[in-house]
């Protein structure tokens, strides 16, 4: 039996005239039909994730497919029991994907319509994973990789996507002469990043067409060789990919035990995404470090209305105090 809510993930690189007005009109339409989600609009295209019941999402897909240049836009559809978003946002940005090129000159940005890596089907990508001479590079953020990733994929030491070009340049000698295959959640980041690799001089560059979400739904590969869960940017936080032999790879930030539950650090000025159990969240006041635990704006403390005495007691239980930083 079908679930009542559909989640649509999509993007398309396509020139949009008067993109700011397009974004405003798009928001008005989405609100008029009761859709929820988050959409980015730029001169270079559109990128979004939205959710609603069957009728609402069908209206939205029909509307998007009626727009110039978007007749063939590919919607990736998940069925869920509950809404994946609470509100509806449509925002105009300079780019739907920001690579963070060092000169900050948008004119030198990559246009995936002109330069991008070869598309690989899920089966072709699985073959690449099994090929010892192919480098498989995860283009997502570190916290996304830590929750789940393809077996054997390289984890760049980056906090966000715009740090990736510099990381690759720093490690260029390790795989410049090899075949390089990249992947991301739905494909939008790889379209641009694989094009950047081509421009950098990499000779054999591929990308997982449709991203991890498509790989997990493919009837042939069934998500095999994916370990852990897929981080998604909505209320679901994590979804399954591997339907053959799933395992947990996420580790609790505090004690290293298997964990797939993400929270944001209680310190709003840190906001690091960490994996942790409810028990350890309570024990460590949702702070990823001593400084975050004792920060005067710690959200966990305020949300749970903890007194100073209660905070002191919990800190003492882990060998800390309000004014002493652990060695």
Curated annotation (Swiss-Prot):
Keywords: Oxidoreductase, tRNA processing
EC annotation from Swiss-Prot or TrEMBL: 1.14.-.-
GO biological process: tRNA modification
SMART domains: RHOD
Record's catalysed reaction(s): uridine(34) in tRNA + AH2 + O2 = 5-hydroxyuridine(34) in tRNA + A + H2O
UniProt-annotated catalytic positions: 184
Family statement: Belongs to the TrhO family.
Name of the protein this chain belongs to: tRNA uridine(34) hydroxylase
Lineage: Bacteria, Bacillati, Bacillota, Bacilli, Lactobacillales
